Amino acid sequence: MENKPQILQTKSKNTPNKGGKLSINDFEIGRPLGKGKFGSVYLARTKTGHFHCAIKVLFKSQLISGGVEHQLEREIEIQSHLQHPNIIRLYNYFWDAKKIYLILEYAPGGEMYKQLTTQKRFTEAMAGKYMYEIADALSYCHRKNVIHRDIKPENLLIGAQGELKIGDFGWSVHAPSNKRQTMCGTMDYLPPEMVNGNSHSDAVDLWAIGVLCYEFLVGKPPFEHENQADTYSAIKAGRFTYPDFVKKGARDLIGKLLVVDPRRRCSLQEVKDHYWVTSMLDSCRRAAEKQKAERAASLRDH
């Protein structure tokens, strides 16, 4: 019988404050930020230093009955080693007899999915800026041999400066030398190679950000259909259409990412250098500078 990791043994707990280990008593717990299948996330701050963070509280019994204990181990192992401005930091973790606590960076802008639902779709400038940020974050992950495999608005957060942050690494893997064949991720975002049950590589993340870019601009994924069979059929064929309002530059980028053959998808560097992305970044910078100048002028007038 396979041994459970120490963190998941139901009788296992670390002694509060012994050997520098944390406990829940070191934090003031605030409002809930979100709820998942295996627990909840709360706003919190440390009692000493008043450092704001988010605490993900997971129940061991639910993780074990859901068979995802190794997925959590992997998430902790991967996320604790990632430091990038567009990736949520995992600062620390600890556990008691029943729960596991992940101490995460707090993203005051909240969930990308909620923003997209409220706004229906993002402006071109915002979508382009987000595409640059996610391409930069994934380039960093891929250099460390980490494939995310579950990029979607629900797994993205917005930081204090309005920047995109990748927030959930539950499905990610360290890319081995041989290619993987596990089916994972969200149906609308699955690439053809996964739908066909073929091996896959880090190119799955390229397909996913193509879907993401489309959803940012249109408000729904490109392969969304009433039933699963039609969705899968459209994904396998790379078959989708654009509403008239999606402009040429965005179509060009999306078309270079949503390529059925994973070897022919454009690279993350090509996403960052794409003329549409760079022009949208320039628009965002100009708008930010204008806003800053207007704020400074209004302060002078008072």
Swiss-Prot record:
<dbReference type="GO" id="GO:0032465">
    <property type="term" value="P:regulation of cytokinesis"/>
</dbReference>
<dbReference type="InterPro" id="IPR000719">
    <property type="entry name" value="Prot_kinase_dom"/>
</dbReference>
<dbReference type="InterPro" id="IPR008271">
    <property type="entry name" value="Ser/Thr_kinase_AS"/>
</dbReference>
<keyword id="KW-0156">Chromatin regulator</keyword>
<dbReference type="GO" id="GO:0045184">
    <property type="term" value="P:establishment of protein localization"/>
</dbReference>
<dbReference type="GO" id="GO:0051256">
    <property type="term" value="P:mitotic spindle midzone assembly"/>
</dbReference>
<keyword id="KW-0217">Developmental protein</keyword>
<keyword id="KW-0131">Cell cycle</keyword>
<keyword id="KW-0469">Meiosis</keyword>
<comment type="function">
    <text>Serine/threonine-protein kinase which mediates both meiotic and mitotic chromosome segregation. Required for histone H3 'Ser-10' phosphorylation. Phosphorylates tlk-1 and zen-4.</text>
</comment>
<protein>
    <recommendedName>
        <fullName>Aurora/IPL1-related protein kinase 2</fullName>
        <ecNumber>2.7.11.1</ecNumber>
    </recommendedName>
</protein>
<dbReference type="GO" id="GO:0051257">
    <property type="term" value="P:meiotic spindle midzone assembly"/>
</dbReference>
<keyword id="KW-0723">Serine/threonine-protein kinase</keyword>
<dbReference type="GO" id="GO:0000776">
    <property type="term" value="C:kinetochore"/>
</dbReference>
<keyword id="KW-0206">Cytoskeleton</keyword>
<dbReference type="GO" id="GO:0000794">
    <property type="term" value="C:condensed nuclear chromosome"/>
</dbReference>
<feature type="compositionally biased region" description="Polar residues">
    <location>
        <begin position="1"/>
        <end position="17"/>
    </location>
</feature>
<comment type="similarity">
    <text>Belongs to the protein kinase superfamily. Ser/Thr protein kinase family.</text>
</comment>
<feature type="binding site">
    <location>
        <begin position="33"/>
        <end position="41"/>
    </location>
    <ligand>
        <name>ATP</name>
    </ligand>
</feature>
<dbReference type="GO" id="GO:0030496">
    <property type="term" value="C:midbody"/>
</dbReference>
<feature type="binding site">
    <location>
        <position position="56"/>
    </location>
    <ligand>
        <name>ATP</name>
    </ligand>
</feature>
<dbReference type="GO" id="GO:0030261">
    <property type="term" value="P:chromosome condensation"/>
</dbReference>
<dbReference type="InterPro" id="IPR011009">
    <property type="entry name" value="Kinase-like_dom_sf"/>
</dbReference>
<dbReference type="GO" id="GO:0005634">
    <property type="term" value="C:nucleus"/>
</dbReference>
<dbReference type="GO" id="GO:0004674">
    <property type="term" value="F:protein serine/threonine kinase activity"/>
</dbReference>
<keyword id="KW-0498">Mitosis</keyword>
<dbReference type="GO" id="GO:0000922">
    <property type="term" value="C:spindle pole"/>
</dbReference>
<dbReference type="GO" id="GO:0019894">
    <property type="term" value="F:kinesin binding"/>
</dbReference>
<dbReference type="GO" id="GO:0051233">
    <property type="term" value="C:spindle midzone"/>
</dbReference>
<dbReference type="GO" id="GO:0051117">
    <property type="term" value="F:ATPase binding"/>
</dbReference>
<dbReference type="GO" id="GO:0005813">
    <property type="term" value="C:centrosome"/>
</dbReference>
<dbReference type="GO" id="GO:0005876">
    <property type="term" value="C:spindle microtubule"/>
</dbReference>
<keyword id="KW-0963">Cytoplasm</keyword>
<keyword id="KW-0808">Transferase</keyword>
<feature type="domain" description="Protein kinase">
    <location>
        <begin position="27"/>
        <end position="277"/>
    </location>
</feature>
<dbReference type="Pfam" id="PF00069">
    <property type="entry name" value="Pkinase"/>
</dbReference>
<feature type="active site" description="Proton acceptor">
    <location>
        <position position="150"/>
    </location>
</feature>
<keyword id="KW-0418">Kinase</keyword>
<feature type="region of interest" description="Disordered">
    <location>
        <begin position="1"/>
        <end position="23"/>
    </location>
</feature>
<dbReference type="GO" id="GO:0005737">
    <property type="term" value="C:cytoplasm"/>
</dbReference>
<dbReference type="GO" id="GO:0032133">
    <property type="term" value="C:chromosome passenger complex"/>
</dbReference>
<dbReference type="GO" id="GO:0007052">
    <property type="term" value="P:mitotic spindle organization"/>
</dbReference>
